[in-house]
From Swiss-Prot:
The keyword Nucleotidyltransferase applies. It catalyses: beta-nicotinamide D-ribonucleotide + ATP + H(+) = diphosphate + NAD(+). The lineage of its organism: Archaea, Thermoproteota, Thermoprotei, Sulfolobales, Sulfolobaceae. It comes from Sulfolobus acidocaldarius (strain ATCC 33909 / DSM 639 / JCM 8929 / NBRC 15157 / NCIMB 11770). This is Nicotinamide-nucleotide adenylyltransferase 2. Its EC number is 2.7.7.1.
């Protein structure tokens, strides 16, 4: 059994994230999606709760007909010590044998812990970028709606996530 771990904050889950999940599921038997900064919400950088992010991801994967029996979604709170971060992840996640990431620090930490690193293609990272999407939402730029899966768009509108983000920004 080849099990991969894909960490991210997913604030919000966008089309680039979805493409990484699809790519990953072609390379591993099971996928653990780790929702980082799980304790954070209602801030400019982390506007959505861990539960809301789980909901975004599950709805999207279900809509895409991806086999949810092969996917774990695990929220993990931050720890502010890079030297023990991999051990922290291993405490919360099921066993895995490969990390799926393009983040240089994440890759370095897992390599040092003797975990294989798989780097997915970039999938237009300048376009599909959660920071940009949050900025578009705050500015009222409707382009953000094209950068997230339809299920995420519907969910964010359902929970008034766009209004929340503008309110947090003081608008």
């Amino acid at each position: 059994m080849h099990r991969g771990l894909y960490p991210g904050r997913f604030q919000p889950f966008h089309i680039g994230h979805l493409e990484v999940v699809k790519w990953s599921m072609k390379h591993v038997d099971e996928l653990i999606i780790v929702i980082g900064s799980a304790q954070e919400s209602h801030t400019l950088s982390n506007p959505f709760t861990a539960g809301e992010r789980i909901e975004m991801i599950r709805r999207t994967l279900d809509k895409e007909n991806l086999d949810l029996s092969k996917v774990y979604i695990i929220p993990i709170p931050d720890i502010m010590m890079n030297s023990v971060w991999v051990s922290h992840i291993k405490t919360f996640a099921p066993n895995f044998d490969v990390i799926i990431s393009r983040n240089p620090l994440v890759n370095r930490l897992f390599k040092e812990a003797n975990v294989e690193v798989l780097q997915p293609p970039p999938f237009d990272r300048h376009k599909y970028n959660s920071t940009l999407i949050r900025r578009y939402i705050i500015e009222g730029n409707e382009e953000w709606k094209k950068l997230v899966p339809k299920s995420v768009l519907d969910y964010l509108l359902e929970i008034h996530g766009d209004e929340r983000l503008r309110s947090i920004a003081g608008l």
